[in-house]
């Protein structure tokens, strides 16, 4: 039957505004306050899950836009990227549900499209050496399983599962391992996105550990590409979860 309702239902407007707000606030915490991308996004997730659980998912989605590097996207660019991500979120709200990393993929699309429209080049990097890569993969497995446990076993939900693990990693790892702690914190929150998967998609911890291995491997070997784009980490997790 043809749709006779409003062109943009109120529910969708609230979802759009949640994604948009999450992006702007996360970028402000990340760059304006100087908390860094991992802590900023995780903090938005924890606050959203605690204070606004009904809109925690779109707010957390937006927070990934705010993880963008200021070397790639300025505050003005993030406003546009957040709006694009909000529109994509509304359009994609009924597909790929339960797959960890979906939200980051939406955010990444907003950031990459904004960078393309603005003529901004994404950052490049190098593949880390084997000793660092091995620690990254171990971190990825632990973070993915930990987020899954909080999400599914403890019943706290996907947003809190990921955000708690990301916040702990973002605060603890740089202090604990000064030389590569910041990198491991990034891996930690990346893998936590895989842990957002529902039990229907990833039924047990063993398969989540496998997803964590894949996230770690993809993270390591994608290091030279798409740097500075908010949502790249979620895209990494999304592909890994689908592969499992």
Task: Annotate each language-model stretch with its function.
Residues 1-4:
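Intrinsically disordered, low-complexity regions flanking or connecting the multi-pass transmembrane cores
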Residues 7-121, 127-141, 148, 152-244:
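C-terminal transmembrane helix-loop-helix hairpin of multi-pass membrane proteins
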